[in-house]
């Protein structure tokens, strides 16, 4: 039973981590394109998702803070 639960949790966490990384990449892409408005929108979309993953324990709160600080 524990093995099944662990696998289910691992897949769920992998999905959430992938989603978070995608949002972060979108911010980097928008910044690289030079479109300030798109970059701001991408950052505003990314910020609550990163915070939520830190609250849920997927990443450490300091890592979430570092991602946000590096992208501001």
Swiss-Prot record:
Family statement: Belongs to the bacterial ribosomal protein bS20 family.
SUPFAM superfamilies in the cross-refs: Ribosomal protein S20 (SSF46992)
Cellular component GO terms, alphabetical: cytosol; small ribosomal subunit
Name of the protein in question: Small ribosomal subunit protein bS20
A Gene Ontology molecular function term of the record: small ribosomal subunit rRNA binding
Role noted for this protein: Binds directly to 16S ribosomal RNA.
Domain of life (superkingdom): Bacteria
Keywords recorded for this protein, A-Z: Ribonucleoprotein, Ribosomal protein, RNA-binding, rRNA-binding
GO BP, sorted A to Z: translation
Disulfide-bonded cysteines: none
PANTHER family from the UniProt entry: 30S RIBOSOMAL PROTEIN S20, SMALL RIBOSOMAL SUBUNIT PROTEIN BS20C
Origin species: Proteus mirabilis
Gene name linked to the record: rpsT
One Pfam family recorded for the sequence: Ribosomal_S20p
